[in-house]
């Protein structure tokens, strides 16, 4: 269309008388169209204008930068919101004591308060323990061990009480804690060996009270001294005299301790 119009105009100018070139109109030629650059990609030819490509590249770059900036701004805003929420939660959070149910603003304050409660309870337990030990079993020197080990009975040797409980050495009675481990009295039928009855230990009446009182004396040194003196005076009667009624000769008993 442009070429035909140009030809018509030139044809009209030929018919018109023109005195000078200045009267001629100025007509610009249309620029020739550049051939589109051919791009081969994976064996296929792609045709596109360079101008379009150049204009598209900066626009894409601008859009990507705008998207990046918007995403960063959104992330920053989200972080600020999270920080504000954490601050609000910390301000609203209360640490409650398990003992008195009081609220504290920080965990450090709560820890110190609970440690004070624990110390008070330990002191209270110690005070209750000492009061219990003071009121229960005050006359027993071993009441502490009896409370801890549940051991309420004393254990004394039984040989000191067998003679007095069985055969009545004197009219003096022994204390109650000396007579707990006594044996039962012998039966009417004494034990026999090969048909012969065994003899029984008997305490002579002359030495029963003195010897046993010497054993029960408070000081052990005096008890052993009286024991040695009486054994030197009466060697045949100390410590006990064995009565053997109708014992056969062929029966021999070893009664040495």
From Swiss-Prot:
Q: What induces it?
A: By gibberellin.
Q: Where is the composition biased (Polar residues)?
A: 50-65
Disordered, as annotated region: 48-92, 108-128, 214-238
Which segments does the record annotate as C2H2-type zinc fingers?
A: 95-117
Say what happens when this gene is deleted: Reduced trichome production on cauline leaves, stem branches and sepals.
* UniProt record, GO biological process: abscisic acid-activated signaling pathway; cytokinin-activated signaling pathway; gibberellic acid mediated signaling pathway; negative regulation of abscisic acid-activated signaling pathway; regulation of DNA-templated transcription; trichome differentiation; trichome morphogenesis
Spell out the PROSITE patterns in the cross-references.
ZINC_FINGER_C2H2_1, ZINC_FINGER_C2H2_2
User: InterPro entries under this entry?
Assistant: GIS/GIS2/ZFP8 (IPR044291), Znf_C2H2_sf (IPR036236), Znf_C2H2_type (IPR013087)
Locate the compositionally biased regions of type Basic residues: 115-126
Q: Name one GO cellular component term.
A: nucleus
Q: Where does this polypeptide localize?
A: Nucleus
Q: In which tissues is it expressed?
A: Expressed in developing cauline leaves.
Q: Which Pfam families match?
A: zf-C2H2_6
Q: What else is known?
A: Seeds over-expressing ZFP8 show decreased sensitivity to inhibition of germination by abscisic acid (ABA).
Job description of the protein: Probable transcription factor required for the initiation of inflorescence trichomes in response to gibberellin and cytokinin. Is not involved in the regulation of trichome branching. Is functionally equivalent to GIS2. Acts as a negative regulator of abscisic acid (ABA) signaling during germination and early seedling development.
PANTHER family attached to this UniProt entry: ZINC FINGER PROTEIN 8 (PTHR46547:SF10), ZINC FINGER PROTEIN GIS (PTHR46547)
Protein name (Swiss-Prot/TrEMBL): Zinc finger protein 8
Q: What is the species listed in this Swiss-Prot or TrEMBL entry?
A: Arabidopsis thaliana (Mouse-ear cress)
